[in-house]
């Protein structure tokens, strides 16, 4: 939580109480959404904090849906970190140890198992849609893809989840 204090202290004085409330409201949802998207909590909190830091320097009046904007920025940050980690693994660079206890507990949750069965794109769009209420048009703009692709991807993801539910 130390990073939370740093983020709040850099917020301009006039809006700090409002910004603190938004952080408290959105941060847990963003962490859950990114973990659901990625299928892991590794790197998620860092990506969320980086997204909030980016929001501090962004023109927030130009952001229609702060939760969706933060999710998109955090997802891109997480993807970059995952690519760097993949390169480090390929080069066999040492990596800091991660506690596996939380990871094992999270992986036992049916929802994460179901989401893991989806493609990355399906997972990202479905989580953004249901955690942050982004419309298909907003998803298309945020993810730089045609609206029809968004619609088809969401339908395919929902069908896969329904099929998994029927097999339980």
Question: Predicted segment positions?
Answer:
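A short, charge-rich alpha-helical start-of-domain segment used by transcription regulators
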Residues: 2-32, 42, 61, 123
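Internal acidic/polar
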Residues: 5, 80, 88-115, 135
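C-terminal flanking helix
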Residues: 27, 31, 52, 119, ...
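Structural recognition of an alpha-helix C-terminal capping motif at a helix-to-coil junction
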Residues: 46-53, 57, 64-76
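Arg/Lys-rich amphipathic alpha helix in sigma70-family domain 2
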Residues: 61, 65, 72-93, 103-104, ...
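DNA-recognition helix of helix-turn-helix
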Residues: 75, 79, 137, 143-168
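A short pre-motif secondary-structure segment
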Residues: 125-129
